[in-house]
């Protein structure tokens, strides 16, 4: 993985066709293959082009609440239960930077429209949340997971990840500890069978 890809709206990767495009897919880390901070993770792939890929871990909450995060950036969040929601570890790259995966897309300064969802990195989405008119559903992370050109394809060929079409219900409505098994159910995969087989469905 690499930190060479910077996810700004003015730096959206080119849309050259890929043989396999993992955008809007869940990647599930294969036990015993993916190690370190990404072991056991489910990653939602926001962008995947010839220049690389960018995703957010969706099942690794931190000890930081949204209220505390907002306080750190001089915003006051008093809306419950939003203020008690947890901030997630989004990946090992730029862990001091916030990323908001949300629905509906809305109109924010630095956003990438992902179809049903959007990824926003600008402060205005958090200001909207503080004002009580933010996105109806959101997941806030610090950091992201990034791959350089060809890296994700290589890792898939090495069976490092399982992939399946993303389901926003799992992102927003399923408890973090249940998101990995819930994503596995989309594949019809038994956890004990993960040691072998191809990296994608």
Curated annotation (Swiss-Prot):
Transmembrane segments: none annotated. SUPFAM superfamilies: VC0467-like (SSF143456). It comes from the Bacteria. One of its GO terms (cellular component) is cytosol. NCBIfam families: PRK00228.1-1, PRK00228.1-2. Belongs to the UPF0301 (AlgH) family. HAMAP family: UPF0301. This is UPF0301 protein BP0319.
């Amino acid at each position: 993985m690499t930190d060479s890809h910077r996810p700004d709206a003015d730096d959206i990767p080119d849309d050259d066709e890929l043989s396999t495009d993992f955008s809007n897919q869940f990647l599930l880390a294969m036990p015993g293959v993916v190690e370190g901070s990404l072991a056991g993770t489910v990653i939602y792939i926001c962008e995947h082009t010839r220049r690389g890929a960018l995703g957010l871990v969706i099942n690794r909450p931190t000890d930081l609440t949204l209220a505390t995060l907002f306080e750190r950036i001089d915003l006051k969040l008093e809306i419950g239960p939003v203020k008690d929601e947890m901030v997630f570890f989004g990946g090992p790259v730029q862990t001091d930077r916030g990323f908001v995966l949300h629905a509906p897309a809305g109109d924010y300064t630095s956003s990438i429209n992902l179809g049903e969802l959007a990824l926003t990195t600008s402060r205005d989405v958090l200001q909207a949340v503080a004002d009580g008119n933010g996105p109806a559903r959101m997941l806030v992370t610090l950091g992201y997971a990034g791959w350089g050109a060809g890296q994700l394809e290589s890792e898939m060929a090495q069976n490092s990840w399982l992939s399946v079409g993303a389901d926003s219900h799992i992102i927003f409505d399923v408890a973090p500890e249940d998101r990995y098994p819930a994503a596995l159910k989309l594949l019809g995969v038994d956890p004990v069978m993960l040691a072998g087989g191809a990296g994608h469905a």
